[in-house]
């Protein structure tokens, strides 16, 4: 155990240790939250990623997962550095806090930037995906994503079911007389899309575009808020770490 020059220094260092220990606990919990949000985003939204032109949404989630894992590992290091009072461990802990701060800030900014251009991207890309790529050879993943999108959000077409009338899929022989894909149906059975009546298919104002846009916007805001929120919390941790490191450096003998 270390020895200090004065009782006052001893009390101050112990006080800083307790503050840093409390911070590190909440920091570790925050890391678990960041990791959970990142994994949940990818697992729950992975089915929709194929209909997005940009990879920014997925990139933000992967960055959050990386940051969450790094936070939890760093948290364990922090507990050790505080208990053992090792200046080298505290320096490493501070550097890792700084790296994580920058990583989470980047993830939060990416989510915010993508949120700003989400509407325009969806309008351009979703219409083209439905018209040109759905049901085509080599586009199995896109087809599955659109089917899941229409079933999950109970919608049909980008803006309305009429969007399907001029799609490549509906004009092909393989459509077997369907007016819309079967995934537009309220109860999905083979070739149910041959009857495009409101009692049979989803007729939603704004179509899938409006619902997907709102869905992604909500989760981008959540990702951004979690990333930036935990990053701001880390500023307190870096300040406390510097203070403790400085005290230990001054008063050890």
Swiss-Prot record:
GO terms for cellular component: plasma membrane. The chain crosses the membrane at residues 19-39, 63-83, 93-113, 220-240. CDD domains: CD151_like_LEL (cd03155). It is found in: Membrane. It holds the Pfam family Tetraspanin. Keywords: Glycoprotein, Membrane, Transmembrane, Transmembrane helix. It comes from the Eukaryota. It is a multi-pass membrane protein. Glycans are attached at residue 127. Its main location: membrane. InterPro entries: Tetraspanin/Peripherin, Tetraspanin_animals, Tetraspanin_EC2_sf. Belongs to the tetraspanin (TM4SF) family. This is Tetraspanin-11. The lineage of its organism: Eukaryota, Metazoa, Chordata, Craniata, Vertebrata. The gene is TSPAN11.
